[in-house]
């Protein structure tokens, strides 16, 4: 079973906003108390938090589906809905957040950093908040909007000061175990280490972390041997330590050729913009396993060539601990120098998300061809949100939506795009709400005489009132009385006769 996971896909669903409430205050001796419907509560966001106590994404590998709570609906007496509780997901420091298309959304490189991965829906307004001087008692409320629902990819990149790189079985895990309190898995076969191991080294007044990166082989920068998975963890390290095996028995291998292959793979690996290339970072070389006589001889043989290339070379043994103290102090010097340079460099500019300008066009209109004629598609944040907030079972709410769209300039835009009465209009991408567009001719002031919950521009679809039923009943009774009177008049005029040809007393029959 996996115990270390550095890449996972999360399926997130943020909480929806609560619906607003339609309510009118009814209290003795206060006939004009007005509307008192409360607003719906906002849903809960899903927030990622960089936590130094978390070292793996294993918990999200086993449970990738996460959702936050919805906002509560509004209630009467001006009571607002409850706020949905935000869901905090703790991730390791160094986690990179990407969308489903691979675009980077956030880099959780600082402990305590927070990022809203899924934004919650907004609560709808109650009719008390929608009341105006012209619409004193709205018979509708706005619905809550839906929260974000989608996938994000979490990719962990280990944050350490020094990365140990080298061929498999070069002794990197043994070195981490020898200079720190870490206890990585150690065995006598290649690729024993399948995930990075971190160790903390304390030397005099210096303290730094080292990362045991799994073994690299030729072609690692192209993905061979899971190389891309391994090289990703080298990106954030400020210094590199090449661990070279001087006791290898593989044909065709020696410390010089191993170093050349590792350098080639490091040079071919693309680092993100703004980061120092891997080969431009401080590097040291450790010739390992000198406790073996043949290995010590080989180390003495290759040392001059490595020093001629400009490297500082250390002969070490993780078994006898020879040279480890000198190596630890040398690594501490590199780390302190890197930290000093990082403190002197100006801080990277902070990305600030600014709201759109007031005069920016709030929507666009696109004409799409359809099988039954042109479809005019309205794309914009406001129109799409307003459609989500509209209760289409309430005629007054539909009329309010029409007023908002007209005030925003959607109708003028449709006219300019060539739309005519009866044209199909869709708001939003995909299968949005389809309208048979009718231009608004009635002003809001003329609509205030409509009963609550109705709009004169929308065909009435509600059932008949008691007054309408009474009027229909009396109309039917009057029609029956008129029919009887007509029969009497026709009988008196002799228009009716029996089968034998004699006249029938229509009036007596009508009375009977």
Swiss-Prot record:
Subunit record text: Monomer.
Molecular functions per Gene Ontology: GTP binding; GTPase activity; magnesium ion binding
Function noted in UniProt: An essential GTPase which binds GTP, GDP and possibly (p)ppGpp with moderate affinity, with high nucleotide exchange rates and a fairly low GTP hydrolysis rate. Plays a role in control of the cell cycle, stress response, ribosome biogenesis and in those bacteria that undergo differentiation, in morphogenesis control.
The EC number(s) this enzyme carries: 3.6.5.-
Region of interest (Disordered), residue spans: 491-512
Start-end of Acidic residues biased regions: 497-512
Cell division keyword on record: no
Name this polypeptide is given: GTPase Obg
Gene3D superfamilies the UniProt entry points to: GTP-binding protein OBG, C-terminal domain, GTP1/OBG domain, P-loop containing nucleotide triphosphate hydrolases
GO biological process: ribosome biogenesis
Binding site for Mg(2+): 173, 193
């Amino acid at each position: 079973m996996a115990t270390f996971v550095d890449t996972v896909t999360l399926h997130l669903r943020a909480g929806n906003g609560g619906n607003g409430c339609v309510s009118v205050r009814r209290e003795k001796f206060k006939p004009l108390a007005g509307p008192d419907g409360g607003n719906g509560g906002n849903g809960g966001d899903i927030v990622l938090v960089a936590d130094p106590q978390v070292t793996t994404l294993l918990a999200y590998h086993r449970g990738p589906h996460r959702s936050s709570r919805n906002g509560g609906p509004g209630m009467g007496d001006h009571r607002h809905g409850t706020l949905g509780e935000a869901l905090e997901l703790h991730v390791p420091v160094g986690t990179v957040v990407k969308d489903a298309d691979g675009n980077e959304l956030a880099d959780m490189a600082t402990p305590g950093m927070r990022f809203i991965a899924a934004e919650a829906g907004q609560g709808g307004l109650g009719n008390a908040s929608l009341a105006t001087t012209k619409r004193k008692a709205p018979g509708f409320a706005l619905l809550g909007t839906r929260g974000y629902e989608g996938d994000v990819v979490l990719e962990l990149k280990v944050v350490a000061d020094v990365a140990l790189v080298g061929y498999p079985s070069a002794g990197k895990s043994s070195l981490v175990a020898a200079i720190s309190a870490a206890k990585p898995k150690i065995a006598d076969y290649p690729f024993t280490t399948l995930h990075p191991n971190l160790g903390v080294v304390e030397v005099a007044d210096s303290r730094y972390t080292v990362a045991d990166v799994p073994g690299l082989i030729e072609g690692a920068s192209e993905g061979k041997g899971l190389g891309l998975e391994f090289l990703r963890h080298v990106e954030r390290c400020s210094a590199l330590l090449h661990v070279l095996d001087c006791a290898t028995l593989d044909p065709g291998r020696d410390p010089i050729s191993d170093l050349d292959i590792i350098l080639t793979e490091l040079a071919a690996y693309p680092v993100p913009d703004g980061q120092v290339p891997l080969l431009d970072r401080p590097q040291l070389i450790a010739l390992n396993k000198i406790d073996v006589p043949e290995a010590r001889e080989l180390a003495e043989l290759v040392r001059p060539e490595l020093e001629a290339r400009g490297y500082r070379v250390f002969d070490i043994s993780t078994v006898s601990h020879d040279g480890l103290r000198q190596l630890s102090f040398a690594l501490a010097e590199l780390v302190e120098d890197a930290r000093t340079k990082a403190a002197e460099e100006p801080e990277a500019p902070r990305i600030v998300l600014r709201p759109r300008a007031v005069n920016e066009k709030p929507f666009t209109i696109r004409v799409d061809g359809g099988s039954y004629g042109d479809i005019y598609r309205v794309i914009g944040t406001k129109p799409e949100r307003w459609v989500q907030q509209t209760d289409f079972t309430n005629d007054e709410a539909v009329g309010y939506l029409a007023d908002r769209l007209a005030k925003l300039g959607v109708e003028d835009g449709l006219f300019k795009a060539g739309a005519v009465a009866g044209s199909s209009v869709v708001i939003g991408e995909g299968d949005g709400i389809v309208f048979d567009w009718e231009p608004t001719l009635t002003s809001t002031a003329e609509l205030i005489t409509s009963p609550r919950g109705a709009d004169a521009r929308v065909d009435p679809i509600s059932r008949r009132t008691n007054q309408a039923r009474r009027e229909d009943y009396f109309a039917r009774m009057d029609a029956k009385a008129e029919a009887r009177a007509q029969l009497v008049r026709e009988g008196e005029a002799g228009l009716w006769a029996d089968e034998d040809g004699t006249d029938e007393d229509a009036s007596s029959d009508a009375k009977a």
